[in-house]
Amino acid sequence: KNVAYDVNDADVQVILLVEDSRRFYSAYLPLLYTQLVKQTVRLMGEGGNLDEKLLRLRARAKILLATDMQSARSIIDRYHNNIIGVFTDGKFPNLGSSRDTAGLELVKFIQSRHSNTPILFQSKNLELKEEAESLGVRFLHKEDTALYKRIAEFMVDKMGFGDFIFRSKEGEEVARASTLTE
């Protein structure tokens, strides 16, 4: 309910999860939320009073769930400037087009508008891996025993959920900060 207000007035960021399997989104949502809260708490550090900390916690990124192509595109069109990452299934309802390749179609849709958006493509269908990776997105098999660990790693590596790393023009790390006060 508050997403439109938070994005428009407070410039809050958005993470999009595209998944039609209740089993998987019921597992992913708590994982994503836990990572968000950990990142927010880590960034807050020790400074600030309780009101400031509560405000920062409220301003954390919002996770939006889409269970079909139309919902996913609507969210992307509406919040495109604030999307910091997309987690998409390979197969989900896609009115008028193939359900089996909906995830690939969504990746192409996102990249045609926002080429730098980090995208994690997950599927049980290993046949989609090569094409997903050829589009420059990370592929995870949904039955990987380390799936949740790899999702958390993706958030750190690609979405900035880790230390702030300052690099030289050559790409070498010159400094690192774990909190805003560092």
For the regions a protein language model found, what residue spans apply to each?
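Conserved acidic segment of CheY-like receiver
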Residues: 11-23, 28-52, 63-65
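Short acidic-hydrophobic, aromatic-tinged amphipathic segments that line or gate anion-handling sites
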Residues: 64-67, 139-146
